[in-house]
Amino acid sequence: MFTLHTKERERIMKAIRINETGGAEVMHLEEIEKPTAQAGEVLIKVAAAGINYADLMQRQGTYLTRTRTPMTMGFEVAGTIEALGVGVTTPPVGSRVVAFGAGGYAEYTTALAATIIPIPDNMSFESAAAFPVQGITAYQLLHESTHLQAGESILIHAAAGGVGTLAIQLAKLMGAKTVVGTAGSAEKLQLVRELGADAAINYKDADWAEQVQQATGGKGPDVILEMVGGDIANKSLQILAPFGRMVIYGAASGERAEFSGIQLMYKNQSVIGYWLTAWMSRPDKTAEAAKGLMQYLASGKMRIIVGNTFSLHQAVEAHKAIADRKTTGKVVLTV
């Protein structure tokens, strides 16, 4: 019977892989060769990996960029530094870090040393893995895309999700006068209220748009964070306040939104697109967002909502739970 020698075994790791695009069932736990830190990189022993809706789209082959298979899933991880590549001197081996690491659904991954973020001693790996993608997204949606101002009102769709739960708190910290969040269940609406939203509205209600207008004093929200698409996006633009800004950072429904250029002109409104991957080409801005988030988290002014955790071999179940809208906050895989 063939068995791997100890040294050979040390070069092997477990990872969630896809060999084709499709439903959650195309993901499989496989044994592959452990990566090696190249120049400018660090090798990370993964303790937790965050799951984002973009992961589902990538798995389905519907993401903004082409899904190249075979591939290891995942994009953000928290863990400890196992080894340093050539030219890397800090942080030292053994440091607790969070990073953007392609192939994060695995026991090990590599990341550029310049992009890693130290984890405070009082933060768990699960919480750390929950904030990079969605935290930086929430921060940049408010600071860079819409430039939310103190005293303004904001509508946050999918407010009980990873981005939404952080955006509610950030908007309040930035001085928003009225924060309105939408969600699809009583449990999620309760979470939205607990995080500080002034109004929590069920998007399944036929008159949800009218409820938003009422909550904003009849004017409509000055800022809208939109990631659903289709009719939700269309109605959102209809109630956007004059001189308002609506940023689109997803299309979870898969449905096309249709906007009137005449309306945008008449009401001096703006519709803005946001894609984190493109912002990664501006590491100064990414670092600025990460630093701002860490300051809020370390001070206790913000908290990360880790709603559901699954083990690595439960990646299929985790993706299905997100697709079925059965989760709140951030979904994390533990390794």
Where are these regions (language model features)?
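Mid-domain Rossmann-like dinucleotide-binding core that forms the NAD(H)/NADP(H) cofactor-binding site
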Residues: 129-205
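Glycine-rich beta-strand-centered segment in the early N-terminal region that forms part
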Residues: 33-50, 62-103
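Short, Lys/Arg-enriched N-terminal segments with co-localized hydrophobic residues
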Residues: 2-12
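C-terminal capping/lid region of NAD(P)-dependent oxidoreductase domains
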Residues: 218, 299-308, 316-335
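Short amphipathic alpha-helix with an adjacent loop that forms part of the alpha/beta core around
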Residues: 208-218
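NAD(P)H cofactor-binding loop motif with strongest signal on the N-terminal glycine-rich segment
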Residues: 158-159, 228, 251
